[in-house]
Amino acid sequence: MDLQLPRGTRDILPEEVSKWHFLESAFNKVCENYQYEEIRTPIFEHTELFERGVGDSTDIVSKEMYTFLDKGGRSLTLRPEGTASVVRAFVEHKLYGEVSQPIKMYYNEPMFRYERPQGGRQRQFTQMGIEALGSDDPSIDVEVISLAMEFFRKIGLTNIKLVINSLGDKESRLKHREALVAHFEPHIDEFCAECQVRLHKNPLRILDCKKDHDNPLIQSAPSILDFLNEESVAYFENVKKYLTALEIPFEIDPTMVRGLDYYNHTTFEIMSVEEGFGAKTTLCGGGRYHGLVKEFGGPDTPGIGFGIGVERILLALEKAEINIPETKPLEVYVITAQPEAELKAVTLVNKLRQNGISAEKDYLKRKLKAQLKDANRKKAIYTVILGEEELQTGNYQLKNMETGEQEAVSETTIIEKLTNTKEEK
């Protein structure tokens, strides 16, 4: 019997959770400042949702999904990405009928893909993301990008670069598609079997192929930017203009198509340029989509969003040697100098906690010296020592563990002192 972790998963142990809380808190605050509201969707959906939404020519749908039949014979899939589920919820709950548009949502949820596990990439991973539905104004494209850049600034990741592209509207993409087929078809036997299937199904996917990315034919492929019609050019120019106005530097990569079929117009990636982490490690990716809501049975509604892999961000922070703040410190450790003080320790710890003060005590009946060591290990700011004299007088020894200062004070004074200290901070 194998009782170890399944390959591609990991436990997040208590000493690591503070890092996750730090990222989650930073992301939530940035999203709320931009007026995005949280949405939570099911871990599994009907398989067809991802086949139609993500695209059956993508690696995600063709090779990476965790799909199973339930007891009723229905095909279900653990969600591999966030956008399809959010758009499904938008349609199912008729959020397109809301007076206040666009509808702006964020999520932070586990995703599942059957991939080869490696640094920053697991089979169960956590993705933070946002979706803005209901506006086709290029300024909201820039808002979405700006939000992502602000999140990275907030957590201290500044050694990054923004890369953008435009896939244009439907007309522009059809012309580009024809040019790609004409370019690749005479040499398609030089490509992998998957790319040969993609040629007439979705030739854009060839540009995104992991196996053939070094093939010179990909580098010499027709650029989408040469096929943008007047409307698409104007849209992309506005995106660039707004980014420049916000002083957000960017590069343009006409080969960047992203790994999903639903994108049009603006696509973007934010990459790490941290030495030793990989010059092209993508930390965030997203783009605009105009047909997804209609594909799911709703009205023709534009949208834009992005996804950020939390595990990859944690790895980037580690490589950049950025220290993540620790969790809320232990404020008081109550120490019992004799067994008779145990009852008072229990009630004092409880009262401190009820007053919003983090408190801890010994539960192993250790000696005074061992309790002090435990308080040090837990990085307690103060200790309260309960001995025979303290029980008789009702004044307890409150010790500042950093300065070593110690004073005899009442229970009420301890609570007032620590509460005032918290308010001053």
From Swiss-Prot:
Subunit structure comment from the entry: Homodimer.
Any Gene Ontology CC annotation: cytoplasm
Pfam families on file: HGTP_anticodon, tRNA-synt_His
Name assigned to this protein: Histidine--tRNA ligase
Keyword Iron: no
EC main group: ligase
EC number annotated for this UniProt entry: 6.1.1.21
Single GO BP term: histidyl-tRNA aminoacylation
Keywords on record: Aminoacyl-tRNA synthetase, ATP-binding, Cytoplasm, Ligase, Nucleotide-binding, Protein biosynthesis
Gene Ontology terms for molecular function: ATP binding; catalytic activity, acting on a protein; histidine-tRNA ligase activity; transferase activity
Reactions that this protein is recorded to catalyse: tRNA(His) + L-histidine + ATP = L-histidyl-tRNA(His) + AMP + diphosphate + H(+)
Gene3D superfamilies (alphabetical): Anticodon-binding domain (3.40.50.800), Bira Bifunctional Protein, Domain 2 (3.30.930.10)
Location, primary (coarse class): cytoplasm
Top-level taxonomic group: Bacteria
Family, similarity comment: Belongs to the class-II aminoacyl-tRNA synthetase family.
Location(s) in or outside the cell: Cytoplasm
